[in-house]
Structure formats: structure tokens, C-alpha cells
A protein has these predicted regions:
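A hydrophobic, helix-centered structural microdomain
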Residues: 1-49, 164, 169-185
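Residue-level detector of functionally special positions within alpha-helical transmembrane segments
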Residues: 2-4, 89, 133
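Gly/Ser/Thr-rich helix-start
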Residues: 21, 31, 83, 103, ...
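Short, glycine-rich, amphipathic interfacial segments at transmembrane boundaries or analogous
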Residues: 23-76, 135-154
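Short amphipathic alpha-helical interaction/hinge segments
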Residues: 49-52, 108-111, 183
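A short, structured surface patch at a secondary-structure boundary
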Residues: 65-130, 170-177
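C-terminal terminal-structure detector
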Residues: 122-185
Length: 185
């Protein structure tokens, strides 16, 4: 499945004049706070961090939204190929490489950015006590519609209430969310 998606992203980006890499790696916080490189399809324009800095400097509303949610609802940095991948959660597919290497599991808390550690506050220890997952509580309970604080509450709930049946339930809910495209992008 990675091969056809990779070919799609490559050609779609090239048709739009984007010569950047197809894949994107980013340091994330793993189990017990150990950092690892997480793989994703690149869904944003090159220089996305600089673009975000400029947007936040020019527009206080964007700055407030990003500081509250750690994301933008209508992020102008997303490429058209990236929008399609995010709507179907296909941008996460390369994370199976991280699962293969034992850095992630299929289901678990979201792998947070190292710069978000401070913002995680009291939730940090519980969230990093288990392997991060490709999907989990917040992905199956609203995805991008969930605030950063609510994500942490959901991830802590997962840690404190983990069971095989919770994982089965989350997997089914994630499939439903992806099929109906709720909370994507």
C-alpha cells in the first residue's frame, strides 16, 4: 500500500511544482520519554515552520488558535495531495515503519512533539508510560476537532483504562472516523 500512495504523492506534488521530499520525519516523544524519528508523508509545503511563524506574527487569531490547539483548522500550508492524505488519514501510513521498529504501536497515545513536553504538564508521565500509537483515543474521538488539552485528557484516560477491548473499540471507531472523514485535516 505504501508504494501506490508514495507514487501518488510524488506525482501530485510534482504536477504542482513541489520538488520536495515525499516523506517527512520528525522527532517525537516515545515510551518513557525516549525520542524517536516518526515517519509520515509530507503534507505541508516546504518551510512550513517558517510559514507558521510568519502567519502567527501577522495574525493574532491564528497565533491564539495555534497556541491553544497546536494546529490550525484551515491550515494554508497543506498541499492538495496532503489534504487528500489527511482527509483519509493516509498520511499516517508510513508510521507502520515505526511500529515495525518497535517505536510505536497500532493503538496508544499520540506521539507528541518534544517542544510540547512543557505544555503536557501533569499528563506527561502517564502519556509517555506507554508506546505511542498510530491511532488512539483522540483520533477516534474527533481527531482534528479536539483541543490539545482534551487530547491529553483522552490519552491519560487510555493509559489508566487500557484493555484489549478498549483497543478493539478504538480501532473500530477510528475506521468509522476515517470512512466518514470526520475531524480530518
Amino acid at each position: 500500500i505504501l508504494i501506490p500512495l508514495t507514487v501518488y504523492v510524488f506525482f501530485k506534488n510534482r504536477m504542482e511544482g513541489d520538488r520536495g521530499p515525499v516523506f517527512f520525519t520528525q522527532n517525537r516523544i516515545g515510551k518513557n520519554g525516549k525520542e524517536f524519528k516518526m515517519y509520515k508523508y509530507r503534507t505541508m509545503e516546504l518551510g512550513a515552520d517558517k510559514i507558521l511563524e510568519d502567519l502567527m506574527a501577522k495574525d493574532p487569531a491564528i497565533r491564539e488558535e495555534y497556541l491553544k490547539n497546536k494546529k490550525l483548522a484551515n491550515d494554508p500550508r497543506i498541499t492538495s495531495a496532503g489534504r487528500f492524505l489527511r482527509e483519509k488519514s493516509l498520511d499516517e501510513f508510513p508510521q507502520f515503519i515505526n511500529v515495525f521498529f518497535g517505536q510505536m504501536s497500532l493503538i496508544g497515545p499520540r506521539p507528541y512533539l518534544p517542544k510540547e513536553k512543557i505544555d503536557m504538564g501533569e499528563y506527561y508521565e502517564d502519556v509517555v508510560a506507554c508506546k505511542p500509537g498510530i491511532t488512539g483515543m483522540w483520533q477516534s474521538h474527533g481527531r482534528s476537532d479536539v483541543s490539545f488539552e482534551h487530547r491529553l485528557v483522552l490519552d491519560e484516560y487510555y493509559y489508566r483504562n487500557w484493555s484489549f477491548w478498549l483497543d478493539v473499540t478504538l480501532l473500530c471507531k477510528t475506521v468509522k472516523q476515517v470512512l466518514y472523514g470526520r475531524g480530518a485535516v
